[in-house]
């Protein structure tokens, strides 16, 4: 089975200049859509369990769902990633369950809501890196808080995210601080704040350089060229699915996401992991609303759930192709987690800081 570390996958992405969409998984339909799209496009996969998904489905159920996907598609390299761990303990339990990558979100306190100070973030991330790398498991850290540069409001989803109004110093990751953070923690990947936020309501109008700072990505990448950058809250909020939802009884107000072309620009400057959740939610909801409206006598869940798989699969295919992920699964030769531990121990994977 091709369960690999995120570090190996993102190193390959950096070498060949592509990005990898990281899709949140809550149920069978999402998992199947992601894997069928990856199979069709020969794409490596990052699937992640958010705090909300772990609460909804339970970490053991998610683990076996992902392992089942790996068993059915053994030729596709898969990273099983725990998203937004709020403490080293959460990350440690995920590693015990078999996750090959964890995120220690020390930008927030353990309640997942209160912005943490820098020293706290460094300390808990260092702790997580120490035991994770000893297991060959990758670690993603976070510096800065997700939120809107347009309004200053923090972004929350699935119970994780700062609350209230934040200033620009919290909403934009500082390049110098990023370099210091990576040097001290040795994280494999760093989620940075550039003006994106969780959920569907990211921007009230198509984003500009004032509300989405691709320039900040370039500045951070120049300081930590070997550290893989992560864009959270990067759903593009497809307008066609918004229209379908509202056509069939939905009431979602006007909103815009992160344009795919802006993500592609970020990939040129070190973005290797792109977190996507809302796009699949919108496609799934739109497909169900449309099917039930057109088939009011239907009550077999398999029939309308199959429509969600089709809708989400198309989104996944589009992202794999746009980010350059397509065609790379077969090029990755899996390294075991034990092999990754040996590489960490030899210092081969220590970060470069300019």
From Swiss-Prot:
Bound cofactor: record note: Binds 2 Zn(2+) ions per subunit. One is catalytic and the other provides a structural contribution.
Superkingdom of the organism of origin: Bacteria
Keyword presence, Zinc: yes
Source organism (scientific name): Pseudomonas aeruginosa (strain ATCC 15692 / DSM 22644 / CIP 104116 / JCM 14847 / LMG 12228 / 1C / PRS 101 / PAO1)
Residues annotated to bind D-glyceraldehyde 3-phosphate: 50
Binding site for Zn(2+) 1: 84, 198, 232
Reaction catalyzed: beta-D-fructose 1,6-bisphosphate = D-glyceraldehyde 3-phosphate + dihydroxyacetone phosphate
Gene name per UniProt: fba
Protein family: Belongs to the class II fructose-bisphosphate aldolase family.
UniProt cofactor(s): Zn(2+)
EC number: 4.1.2.13
Record-given protein name: Fructose-bisphosphate aldolase
InterPro entries cross-referenced by the UniProt entry: Aldolase_TIM, Class_II_FBP_aldolase, FBA_II, Fruct_bisP_Calv
GO biological process, one term: glycolytic process
Main function: Catalyzes the aldol condensation of dihydroxyacetone phosphate (DHAP or glycerone-phosphate) with glyceraldehyde 3-phosphate (G3P) to form fructose 1,6-bisphosphate (FBP) in gluconeogenesis and the reverse reaction in glycolysis.
